């Protein structure tokens, strides 16, 4: 699946003198790898894990509700993308950029407000990085290099064992709907014995306190 579906659509980059460090979009996940050349020099390779042509949840063979995130799949097979190099370290990476824009101060009444907000959202994606999230520990020299490229101090680098983006949970819920045994039984609202049918609820409340639960 990786060789046929993912690898042809991947856009790998090796940072070097001829290839500057790419722009990393706010909140998107990238696979970062430390590569060793034949001359024992180290290079940083980067692959974007977001692709509109591929689903983020990949169903594993055998069914039974087993799925894998596409970024984990890319990270696992990343050595096949950078052939001719030795993989010395790898991790998923997410950059969080500053989103502090004063919309009121920047707004001009002569502009269309919808277009103005669209432009504002685009600007937010290009603002300065304030945080780097990693899924694995990486060599200190590599982390320092990432900090230097992104202009972030080392104390703003964090490692997380949890997925760097948990928005896939909603997609997972839809995929597993046929597995009813994984869900709680639907709760049916029940009438409260505190209230009498046929009488105004407000009048009953004025007569005495009522206790409800949900």
Mark where each language-model region is.
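N-terminal localization/anchoring segments of enzymes in phospholipid and broader phosphate metabolism
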Residues: 1-214
């Amino acid at each position: 699946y990786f060789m046929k579906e993912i690898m042809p659509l991947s856009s790998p980059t090796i940072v070097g003198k001829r290839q500057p460090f790419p722009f990393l979009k706010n909140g998107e996940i990238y696979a970062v790898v430390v590569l060793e050349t034949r001359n024992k020099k180290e290079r940083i390779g980067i692959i974007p894990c977001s692709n509109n042509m591929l689903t983020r949840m990949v169903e594993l063979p055998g069914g039974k509700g087993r799925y894998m995130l596409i970024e984990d799949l890319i990270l696992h097979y990343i050595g096949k993308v950078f052939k001719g190099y030795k993989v010395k370290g790898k991790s998923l990476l997410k950059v969080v950029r500053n989103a502090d824009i004063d919309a009121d101060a920047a707004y001009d009444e002569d502009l269309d407000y919808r277009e103005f907000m669209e432009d504002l959202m685009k600007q937010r994606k290009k603002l300065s990085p304030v945080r780097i999230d990693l899924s694995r520990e990486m060599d200190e020299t590599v982390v320092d290099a990432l900090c230097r490229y992104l202009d972030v101090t080392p104390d703003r680098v964090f490692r997380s064992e949890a997925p760097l983006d948990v928005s896939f949970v909603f997609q997972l819920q839809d995929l597993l709907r046929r597995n009813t045994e994984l869900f709680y039984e639907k709760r049916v609202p029940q009438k409260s014995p505190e209230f009498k049918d046929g009488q105004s609820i407000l009048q009953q409340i004025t007569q005495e306190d009522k206790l409800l639960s949900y």
